[in-house]
Amino acid sequence: MAKKGDWVLIHKIVLSPEERAPQVPDDTKKVPLEMWIKGYLNEDAQIGDQVSITTRTKRVEEGKLLEVNPYYTHDFGKFVPELLKISEQVREITFGGEGNE
């Protein structure tokens, strides 16, 4: 359960596919324009509830509650063995070895 004042992430549909501008490319027109916003929760709620938040710039927005205390996650994907081999080859060429003399 999320409490009033918690830092949260919400999701909101800004424009449905039918509301998109005519000059938008066809593949873009097929999907809604979505927005994810972080802010302080204005009332107690459960994940999935429609809630209102106040952003750091004091805007009040409404949307579906997705996460409490959201954080950034990032990685470079799964290990690729070929890149390790290439790294060894580059090191050999750059810093010496029989083939580099």
UniProtKB/Swiss-Prot annotation:
UniProt cross-references to InterPro entries, sorted A to Z: OrtA (IPR047755)
Q: How is its activity regulated?
A: Completely inhibited by p-chloromercuribenzoate (p-ClHgBzO) and acetyl-CoA, and partially inhibited by N-ethylmaleimide.
Which family is it part of? Belongs to the OrtA family.
Keywords carried by this UniProt record:
Transferase
Subunit composition?
Answer: Heterodimer with OrtB.
The protein's name: 2-amino-4-ketopentanoate thiolase alpha subunit
Q: Which GO terms describe its molecular function?
A: transferase activity
Q: Which GO terms describe its biological process?
A: ornithine metabolic process
Describe the reaction catalysed, as an equation. D-alanine + acetyl-CoA = (2R)-2-amino-4-oxopentanoate + CoA
Superkingdom field: Bacteria
Q: What is its EC number?
A: 2.3.1.263
Q: Tell me the organism's taxonomic lineage.
A: Bacteria, Bacillati, Bacillota, Clostridia, Peptostreptococcales
Organism from which the protein derives: Acetoanaerobium sticklandii (strain ATCC 12662 / DSM 519 / JCM 1433 / CCUG 9281 / NCIMB 10654 / HF) (Clostridium sticklandii)
Q: Entry's Pfam families?
A: OrtA
Role according to the record: Involved in the ornithine fermentation pathway. Catalyzes the thiolytic cleavage of 2-amino-4-ketopentanoate (AKP) with coenzyme A (CoA) to form acetyl-CoA and alanine. It is strictly specific for AKP.
